[in-house]
Amino acid sequence: MNNDKKNKKNLLNNELDLAKYTLHNLSADNNDDENELELDWDGIDDEIIDNNQQIYQKKHINHKTRLFIEKDDKLNNHEQIESGNEIINQPKALSGQDFLEFVNSKLVQKNNNFKQNSKFLQNQLTNHELLREKLKPQEDFNKIFKTKDINVTEEIKIKDVKKNSSVSFRNSFNINDLNQNQITNIKSIIDSTLFLAGEEGVSLQDLKRTTGLNESSQLKTILNQLQKDYDVDDSGLVLVQFGEKFKLLTQSKNKDALSKFVTTSFRTPLSQRNLETLAIIAYNQPTTRAKIQAIRDRDPKPAIDALLKLNLIIEAGRQDTPGHPILYTVSQKFYDLFGIRNLTELPRLNKEINEFSPIDESTN
């Protein structure tokens, strides 16, 4: 039986001029024709068998299946084609108009089937009372929550508490939320903390721990008030900020009187070489060893090591350049030693000096 079908297809391909009317069943990457016509290919295959192969199926080398019809009606309904010892009865091929009518009938049939199925679904939803019964909950919603365990008066009480109570957060209040006694107490704590810290000074983080305030803005407001209090009262102390530290210092106007009390002379541990290196770092920070050497024209390693031991400079990371050299900046101790609050108070360099002759380090 399979051989008969193959012979029939071969004869048709060799002898018949196939029509231009084609219906393509393309591969998955190009199935626009199939989607446009919305055909049931299984149904069409059945139709081919029922009509004695009136529509011919041909598979090409590219594995794309196509359906062809014959446009030329030169063949009679009972014309015979001889192939070897076998004679095959060939029915008359369909015309283009017949093919279109056939496709249209398939679409109409499919549409009718869809309408019948839709009508069946609509009939199922006709009974609204049955639908309401299915959607109705098994228990009343109010009955579930109206139990004896819930007291209505307690519920009202809870709502009143939520409405009248104010929620406070640790960092939600400002200086205006503190009364005068609280502000005075905080100032007293700051005074004691500054006295104990001495020349080391205290940072904002230290004051947060002692005062219990968590906002830097709150502390700065109270520190400004405390500084004004010292000025108004003509106190012998002054509150000054050096870098990130706050310190209590004596008034400069009392310098002569205090010099009679302090008779010890202090010797600086810095040589000329170390002072020059420290000055270069202060004016160019953050800076590298190579830049210091380019300015001084000498190897700065001994001076850098000495300044690190004296805690006058610190390592502040590495530069994002080849080799990743270490960056150096001045430390908090630098501000304390030279009485500088910030880098803007450094003496301005004289740009008119064209030559710089450092002291010979052989004497140091």
From Swiss-Prot:
Subcellular location: Cytoplasm
Example GO BP: chromosome separation
Origin: domain of life: Bacteria
A GO cellular-component term linked to this record: cytoplasm
Pfam (any one): SMC_ScpB
Keywords from the UniProt entry: Cell cycle, Cell division, Chromosome partition, Cytoplasm
Sequence similarity: Belongs to the ScpB family.
Assembly and interaction partners: Homodimer. Homodimerization may be required to stabilize the binding of ScpA to the Smc head domains. Component of a cohesin-like complex composed of ScpA, ScpB and the Smc homodimer, in which ScpA and ScpB bind to the head domain of Smc. The presence of the three proteins is required for the association of the complex with DNA.
Function noted in UniProt: Participates in chromosomal partition during cell division. May act via the formation of a condensin-like complex containing Smc and ScpA that pull DNA away from mid-cell into both cell halves.
Protein name: Segregation and condensation protein B
Organism: Ureaplasma parvum serovar 3 (strain ATCC 700970)
